[in-house]
Amino acid sequence: MVSAPAPAMRYVKLDQSEIRQIKELYEGVMSHACHGLFFKEGSVIGTDMAEEALKDRTNFFERAGAILKERGWVEETSFTDTEVVVKGSIEVTPSDIPTCHRLRGILREFYERFKGGRVKCTEEMCASTGHPECRFRIEEM
């Protein structure tokens, strides 16, 4: 018996308003506990993106940034060994606390796959709280 070929990869699109409404729905049920779920979602989402970027290891961070932009997660990124600066995160919405939980999970996944070990990713600055950009600190564990 011949198995059927794998279906072509398909994508769904959510706009910024829909992402915000989903976040508010979860927060209404789970309060801030849902932020960990959003982070884990980001990790899952980031797995295939990281694998795609690793196909060109020499240009991994440039490729990772391009993928994030192509998929609508960000408008601009800048990567170093210890920090990622993001402008135009899709998760930005006015708040007293950082809101880019999924993006933080995606970035952690990128660095863990690139470095081959565990890292901690902390959103130290967020455009949601009035800053001009989001900044994520990367620390090896």
What are these regions (language model features)?
Residues 1-101, 119, 127-135, 139-141:
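N-terminal accessory segment detector
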Residues 101-116:
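Active-site helix/loop of acyl-thioester processing domains in fatty-acid/polyketide metabolism
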Residues 116-122:
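Hydrophobic beta-strand-centered segment that forms part of the acyl-chain substrate-binding groove
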